[in-house]
């Protein structure tokens, strides 16, 4: 390729499997729209006294010729995972390269391999932003900044302590990413999520429990309730913001814990009002700023102090997303890390759609059966019995002899096992008896009554 800068030719052949990854990565960069003269292969730097030097695979510069991105290529899975563990341990090769190109804004660990079964190239990437997020530093001035780091070890400590070893797996080669604009601050339902399948349930449940154990979360009942709240937020988000998802962690380069929780609170308020008819108190950051309109011309310490008090009341008390008890900023950040892992577990999946999806119902049934203690007066009917009872109903006769959709009512619905089982059987019956392909009218005739708020919420969310 004319204009491509080649400093050495160790990777300009296919003698090693890793070289094929470099070739494929360069092809992607060119295909994306990066100019050849901005792509440099095997830039070499001296790594220290007595060191033989270091050689990165790919250096990408911006339009001004400044270093923008350093890419280290590895073979798929095993070598990639090892390199990523090394990076998390002490910075690995990636952070040693930053020391030589201090103006670099991003570093990336990249791997690719041909998948014979799908006839496509699978990729792995970990993109680390090494530029500061002003919002994160503003929220907590005590945190160290990349701008003040003087060496490799200090930069790694900033990444570890301030940005929590944050890395993203998208933001370089996706269709809605422009060249030279690395990272994403906007995610869309159709491009950044995939339909969830029932086969994901076991792995998802295992990951959920692993996160709880990792952070010593012992209140499983409470954790399940928070999970239901998160699902409610995600459903609202998919229905209301398909082109700019709020239920998505954008990475420390573009997001902060406070902004994330604020978005969740807003989605939760909308969901509780729309689906459960409950008015939830929600004070947005904009509401807080608006309360001080009279002080805009004369900002002072009093305003900052009142804002801090607002923040403590808003974020540190009575959260609907508490996996652990939050009473101050330390525990808020600790809880936010758990919350973040839960969100990242689900953000890439799509829960809503035109086709019936039994995932939520199956998931909640499994969680209730395995992780929630039944308190006095609450008894959950086992799923096989629900299936048997619903199957014993004369549904075919009722559907055939009623011109209007038949109504179904469970006046003590609990978590909605009977209702979801009934809803699952309806489509096949109406298609066979009345040649109706869309069961929406029949779904609107399904009702449940439950006095316990938590279970009513579970039943409502499971119905999606």
Can you say where each PLM-predicted feature lies in the sequence?
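Active-site-adjacent loop/helix micro-motif of nuclease/hydrolase catalytic cores
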Residues: 37, 50-53, 67-70, 78-91
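Conserved S-adenosyl-L-methionine
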Residues: 381-464
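Nucleic-acid nuclease catalytic cores
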Residues: 81-138, 142-145
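Active-site metal-binding core of divalent-cation-utilizing nuclease and nuclease-like domains
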Residues: 11-14, 37-65
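Non-catalytic accessory regions of SAM-dependent methyltransferases
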Residues: 163-249
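Long recognition/docking surfaces used for binding and targeting
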Residues: 232, 239-369
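Conserved catalytic cores of phosphodiester-cleaving nucleases, focusing on short active-site segments
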Residues: 25, 56-62, 67-80, 97
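Acidic-basic catalytic patches of nuclease active cores, encompassing PD-(D/E)XK
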Residues: 2-44
């Amino acid at each position: 390729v004319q204009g491509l800068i080649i400093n050495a030719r160790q990777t300009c052949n296919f003698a090693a499997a890793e070289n094929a990854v470099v070739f494929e990565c360069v092809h992607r960069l060119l295909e994306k729209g990066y100019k050849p003269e901005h792509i440099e292969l095997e830039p070499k730097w001296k790594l220290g006294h007595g060191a033989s030097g270091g050689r990165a695979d790919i250096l990408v510069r911006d339009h001004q010729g400044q270093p923008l991105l350093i890419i280290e290529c590895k073979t798929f899975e095993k070598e990639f995972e090892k390199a990523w563990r090394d990076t998390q341990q002490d910075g690995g090769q990636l952070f040693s390269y930053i020391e030589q190109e201090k103006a670099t804004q991003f570093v990336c660990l990249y791997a690719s391999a041909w998948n014979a079964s799908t006839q496509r190239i699978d990729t792995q990437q970990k993109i680390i932003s090494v530029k500061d997020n002003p919002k994160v530093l503003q929220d907590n001035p005590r945190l160290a900044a990349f701008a003040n780091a003087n060496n490799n070890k200090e930069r790694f400590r900033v990444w570890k302590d301030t940005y929590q070893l944050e890395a993203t797996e998208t933001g370089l080669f996706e269709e809605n990413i422009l060249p030279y604009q690395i990272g994403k601050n906007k995610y869309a339902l159709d491009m950044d999520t995939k339909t969830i399948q029932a086969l994901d349930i076991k792995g998802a449940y295992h990951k959920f429990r692993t996160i709880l154990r990792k952070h010593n979360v012992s209140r499983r009942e409470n954790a399940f309730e928070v999970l239901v709240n998160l699902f409610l937020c995600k459903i609202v988000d998919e229905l209301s913001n398909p082109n700019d998802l709020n239920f998505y962690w954008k990475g420390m380069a573009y997001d902060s814990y406070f902004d994330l929780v604020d978005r969740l609170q807003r989605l939760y308020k909308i969901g509780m009002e729309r689906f459960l008819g409950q008015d939830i108190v929600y004070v947005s950051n904009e509401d807080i700023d608006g309360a001080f309109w009279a002080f805009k011309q004369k900002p002072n310490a009093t305003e900052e102090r009142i804002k801090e008090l607002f923040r403590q009341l808003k974020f540190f008390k009575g959260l609907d997303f508490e996996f652990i008890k939050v009473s101050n900023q330390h525990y808020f950040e600790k809880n936010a890390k758990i919350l973040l892992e839960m969100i990242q577990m689900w953000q890439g999946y799509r829960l809503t759609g035109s086709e019936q999806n039994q995932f939520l119902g199956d998931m909640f049934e499994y969680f209730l059966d395995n992780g929630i203690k039944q308190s006095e007066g609450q008894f959950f009917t086992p799923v096989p019995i629900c299936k048997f009872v619903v199957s014993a109903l004369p549904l075919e006769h009722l559907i055939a002899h009623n011109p209007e959709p038949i109504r179904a009512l469970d006046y003590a619905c609990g978590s909605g096992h009977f209702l979801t089982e009934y809803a699952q059987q309806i489509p096949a019956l109406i298609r066979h008896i009345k040649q109706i392909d869309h069961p929406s009218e029949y779904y609107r005739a399904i009702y449940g009554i439950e006095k316990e708020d938590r279970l009513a919420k579970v039943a409502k969310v499971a119905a999606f």
